[in-house]
């Protein structure tokens, strides 16, 4: 059997991280087991569907690398087939026309409530004489179409939850509507009609759709179509245990794209929201996720969207990326932020890449690299007031340490991390001071900050000329500003 799975978002907003997780699991399944991953835009709600939202869905999926295998299906273009399927149901005696008005139905619900009962449609229109139905239709009386729910039970073997069964008398309000009085299909009918046409073999979606599944299975059966497998994924909650929403912060894939999150890190993070690869594995490349993915690892328990975990995950992926690849991402950001122009970065390519190697292993996002890189680029450095207060508290002593370091380093023949470390350790011993007493004033001189990578790494990445110039500039500043 060829597996055919689909992701079917409604274009009424951004691509939510929950939707992206669903798309990812569908995509991983076909990459692992073979088949096609399809995209359907469920745009039947014309009042809320927008082209902007459709573009956001496309852009989000493309950024994540979740490419679909066939032309996009637009549900709204299938209206005639939806109506034809409803007509088949009516002709087969599986559905019937309902002439009850909204007011009449409200009265029935109120009566049921007064009796302390749940409302179930009483099938009064199903008992109409066929000639009466024909007469009303010919007279132009508005009607909806209801599916005739049979007695018994509807069950399926869910890939996540195991066997799920619904007594048919507990399905919604009884005979449910499949076509509105304006001749537009209800969600459950349109979904089944499209899934049949698209030859979908597995429906993988959020477990908030479990209650829709028995209705859909009944429609499949009534249309004489093969019933696909179902897999209902756990919901994604915020840290407070409630369904993830905007009040928890960013929930759109596009938001994280612009916050310095890497697509492969987002995929890795999303994959662990409802799936376990086993063996306590967390950090994975996309090929590793494909290799390890199994429906047996899908989880029932609601997943928690932890932004700090996402940032940690992103840092892991960022640290493993080659500097050249990091440069492709951050260079446009550095240029657009006005920190440096591309010509400058190109002219210092080796030092630029060395600096990225230095920063990427400590950064959580690409945005952090952009914010931290300025001190490592040509030009003077701005001294942070807090760094001056802490690192240069004893200004005369700091100037002495910096001057000695500049003198020692200027005579160093080989400017590499090992040589720099040996040189500065000898200097600390010669001066009879601790490493911190020497390194901290130098750190402020080189970066203007109190926190940075190791001093030897900084010197190696900056190179001889810029490092010595920074130390000389710091001497001058400390001389001018005294104690």
Predicted regions and their residues:
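Hydrophobic alpha-helical segments in the ANL/AMP-binding
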Residues: 27-28, 59-61, 188-192, 442
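N-terminal Rossmann-like or analogous alpha/beta NTP/dinucleotide-binding catalytic cores
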Residues: 1-115, 212-225
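Conserved nucleotide- and phosphate/pyrophosphate-binding catalytic cores
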Residues: 51, 55, 65, 74, ...
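A generic structural motif
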Residues: 43-45, 197, 204, 317
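Short, solvent-exposed beta-strand edge segments and adjacent coil->beta transition regions
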Residues: 12, 70, 199-200, 251
């Amino acid at each position: 059997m060829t597996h055919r799975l689909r992701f079917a978002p409604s274009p009424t907003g951004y691509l939510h991280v929950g939707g992206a997780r669903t798309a990812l699991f569908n995509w991983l399944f076909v990459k692992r087991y073979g088949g096609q991953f399809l995209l359907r835009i469920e745009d039947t709600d014309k009042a809320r569907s927008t082209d902007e939202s459709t573009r956001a869905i496309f852009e989000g999926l493309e950024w994540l690398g979740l490419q679909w295998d066939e032309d996009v299906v637009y549900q709204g273009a299938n209206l005639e087939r939806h109506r034809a399927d409803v007509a088949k149901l009516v002709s087969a005696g599986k559905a019937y026309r309902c002439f009850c008005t909204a007011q009449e139905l409200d009265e029935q619900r109120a009566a049921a409530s007064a009796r302390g009962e749940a409302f179930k449609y009483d099938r009064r229109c199903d008992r109409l004489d066929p000639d009466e139905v024909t007469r009303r239709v010919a007279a132009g009386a508005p009607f909806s179409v209801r599916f005739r729910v049979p007695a018994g039970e509807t069950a399926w073997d869910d890939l996540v939850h195991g066997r799920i069964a619904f007594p048919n008398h507990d399905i919604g309000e009884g005979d449910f509507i499949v076509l509105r009085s304006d001749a537009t299909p209800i969600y459950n009918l349109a979904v089944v009609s499209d899934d049949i046409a698209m030859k979908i073999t597995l429906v993988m979606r959020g477990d908030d759709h479990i209650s829709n599944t028995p209705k859909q299975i009944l429609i499949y059966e009534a249309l004489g179509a093969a019933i696909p497998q179902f897999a209902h994924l756990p919901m994604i909650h915020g840290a407070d245990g409630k369904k993830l929403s905007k009040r928890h912060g960013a929930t759109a894939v596009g938001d994280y794209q612009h916050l310095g999150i890497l697509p492969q890190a987002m995929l890795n993070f999303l994959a662990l929201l409802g799936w376990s690869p086993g063996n306590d594995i967390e950090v994975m490349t996309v090929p590793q996720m494909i290799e390890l993915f199994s429906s047996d690892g899908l989880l029932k328990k609601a997943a928690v969207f932890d932004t700090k975990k996402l940032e940690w995950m992103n840092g892991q992926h960022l640290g493993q990326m080659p500097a050249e690849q990091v440069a492709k991402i951050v260079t446009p950001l550095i240029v657009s932020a006005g920190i440096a122009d591309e010509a400058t970065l190109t002219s210092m390519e080796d030092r630029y890449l060395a600096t990225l190697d230095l920063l990427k292993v400590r950064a959580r996002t690409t945005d952090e690299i952009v914010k931290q890189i300025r001190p490592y680029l040509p030009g003077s450095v701005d001294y942070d007031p807090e760094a001056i207060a802490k690192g240069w508290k004893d200004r005369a002593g700091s100037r002495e340490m910096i001057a000695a370091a500049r003198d020692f380093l200027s005579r160093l023949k080989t400017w590499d991390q090992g040589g720099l470390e040996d040189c500065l350790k000898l200097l600390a011993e010669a001066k009879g001071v601790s490493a911190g007493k020497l390194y901290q004033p130098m750190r402020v001189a080189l970066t203007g900050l109190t926190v940075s990578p190791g001093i030897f790494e900084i010197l190696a990445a900056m190179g001889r000329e810029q490092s010595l110039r920074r130390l000389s500039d710091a001497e001058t500043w400390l001389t001018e500003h005294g104690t």
